[in-house]
Amino acid sequence: MDSEIAFDYSPRFRIFKNGGIERLVPETFVPPSLNPENGVVSKDAVYSPEKNLSLRIYLPQNSVYETGEKKIPLLVYFHGGGFIMETAFSPIYHTFLTSAVSATDCIAVSVEYRRAPEHPIPTLYEDSWDAIQWIFTHITRSGPEDWLNKHADFSKVFLAGDSAGANIAHHMAIRVDKEKLPPENFKISGMILFHPYFLSKALIEEMEVEAMRYYERLWRIASPDSGNGVEDPWINVVGSDLTGLGCRRVLVMVAGNDVLARGGWSYVAELEKSGWIGKVKVMETKEEGHVFHLRDPDSENARRVLRNFAEFLKEETF
């Protein structure tokens, strides 16, 4: 391997000038469990055999034994990690999704996708869309996964993600409207963006902090063929047309000590004046940093994030 390092993110990974990546820490795979954790069970399902891609489904234990026709909201979640790190099966995501399902009484699907730089942008968006389409094969109750057939309420579908996963969730909500998923006039009930990874040249110049330059470099690694850099519509969503956002409600979570918070606020401002028909709200945790609720899930502020998340899912959609 070429020893010239282009980007050093020790102790997680190093990127070399020849395009190679060295992942320095073995990634931990948390297995699914049919033994309930916090009253939640989980299992994995393959959504793309040709790409060897799977996802994890979380279900409240009491729903397993439900004999009636009760359906519960469906949450589709995209993990973060700068498009490069973490997986749907990482400890922090298994812990968070288990807690989220316990708090909201929903069925959740956590999507695994191929990551950069081995698979540059836009591969992960296409993988995520494949997962959405696979999930929606269950809307007729004849899909390959019994839990989704029996328990998912497709009139109450939510998209969510943190950091890079929040970016993915946004693009999936745009594509849902553009591709016109069945049934006719279908809309996502709501979208929750935890500390979204949105950039633009203006934001970077305005902040003038090294941490923001780090996120810019990370994007260039994930999307090396982008001629527009951080003006690329994949990452500069604020500079794109938001009127086609295919959901009725949006909750944006921002953290006061997170340099990406400015992008979250800009997204909210643009959404409000875009002509999009929907409602957007913001929850700010002033004294915390990026994805603190994943790193310290037992803190009071993390619990407050989870409560707000649960309340948003339980609100009636207008």
From Swiss-Prot:
**A Pfam family matched in the record:** Abhydrolase_3
- Where expressed (tissues)? Expressed in roots, stems, flowers and siliques.
Molecular function, one GO term: carboxylesterase activity
Keyword check for Acetylation, yes or no.
Answer: yes
Record's keyword terms, sorted: Acetylation, Hydrolase, Serine esterase
- Which function does this protein serve? Carboxylesterase acting on esters with varying acyl chain length.
What is the protein's given name? Probable carboxylesterase 1
